Amino acid sequence: MRLHKRSLVWGLALSGLAVVLAAAWWASQASREPALWSELRVPPAFAIPRDFDLGEYRLSWGGKGLALSVAGSARPPLWESGGGFLGAGRESAGRLQLRCQEESLESFELVGRRLSLKGHLRCADGRLRAYELSFEPRQGGVEVRVGLADSELNRVALSWRRGAGERLSGIVDDEAEGRSWVLPAGVAGYWSSAGNAFLGHSTAAQSLDLREPGRVQWRAATESARAWLFAAGNREQWQLRSARLEAETRR
């Protein structure tokens, strides 16, 4: 009986070790993978700037990029794309087997307080895949969701700019500068010295890529990718929001 129990304990321990080693191997592979920066193409009609009110926030299209700001505030945007903002791919064992990095933006649709951006991603195999990126004000922030028409693409990448001298704290911090930082499944992100806060949610491991100066890229599992953007006056406000969102996603 004791021998059976010991065998069971050793079996569980080895299984746990295997999971840890597999996760570490995946993280190592993912951190070496080049980022999914995309090139944005828009039709001539989209050269006209436009603004969309989202509760206490405003999403502005400047003709070449997006900027999310606190409405009526002179503070810099809390999220700004500066060009391509969405990429996707098919990932296996921490490596991208297919990359989709040519992006088109073809429509804005505002229904109630939900703004949807729709377009296509051109992948390395030459095929076009439709996407929908939505912004909706929720609980004092803006929730971002990504939808892809092709279930073959299991990873999405959301990209944005970071201000000069903007320092990060939270799950990632300044020590992550110049690295691709693998985050745990669940809710994770950062608060910055500029008062900009980001939280991402994924049921699988996710990552924040800080290898390129002044730019950030978040990668997550397509089927569960959600993100929240909001202004936070200090790290304590960010931590409180993080805890609330973590509890909400577990319901």
Give the location of each predicted region:
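Compositionally biased, intrinsically disordered low-complexity segments
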Residues: M1-H4, A22, R99, F108
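N-terminal Sec-pathway targeting helices
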Residues: M1-L17
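Hydrophobic alpha-helical membrane-insertion segments, chiefly the h-region
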Residues: L17-A27
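Catalytic and substrate-binding clefts that recognize carbohydrates or anionic sugar/phosphate headgroups
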Residues: Q29-R250
